[in-house]
């Protein structure tokens, strides 16, 4: 199967690198100096799971790609989704599936509306991956888990989801085929929102969230509020969402930070709209009280407007 990775950052670059190491047919979409470096020197992967490798992976801009792909992983940031619509339309054939791997809830249905003729699934990822240099991706720690599935009513070619799962597992990625992807993407959104917002509010790595005290209490407050929103939206949590979020945060490398935090620190575009302000808007719409979210939002109102 042919894989196309739209967005070769920490997430997309890690997926591409692992697939390439397993001999799968993968092409990367990137831009700027990062793309030039991948084209000239190969993609450098520094991975706690796989070691260090330089991989010759075909790479191009979205505009220049003119092939077809069986599976398109969308790994751009939430604010860049519109930029890859034309790419999806060109690269898809009748059985192609698009798997968005974004931190922002509701991405699958949002892309599906933009490309109604293509089969769009939904997905999320648990990984610490980031661009550590031009043309270089670092994957930290032991967690690399990909969750994907189709929304109710989406028709997928029989056996395709399982075939993708097998390829990813052969590449060394832990994969869950989700029977309820709406639930699983909400759970991921709730976690990454609490993680990124806490980290950015206090400007600390995750080790500080792992210790008892005010910072951890803020993370718990945010998790409690998003859990209340999830319950109101009919999300069927398999376990207590707050203890789940704490379990995940406590497994992270103490040095790790969320990509939103890194972007804010550098003055780059960030996912603060999707991870903070969209959460607040959704909660207000549902009449959920969110004092912790409102408190942290005060700090970021200026940066967003």
Across the structure, where does each feature detected by a protein language model lie?
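NAD(P)-dependent Rossmann-like dehydrogenase/reductase catalytic/cofactor-binding core
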Residues: 220-305
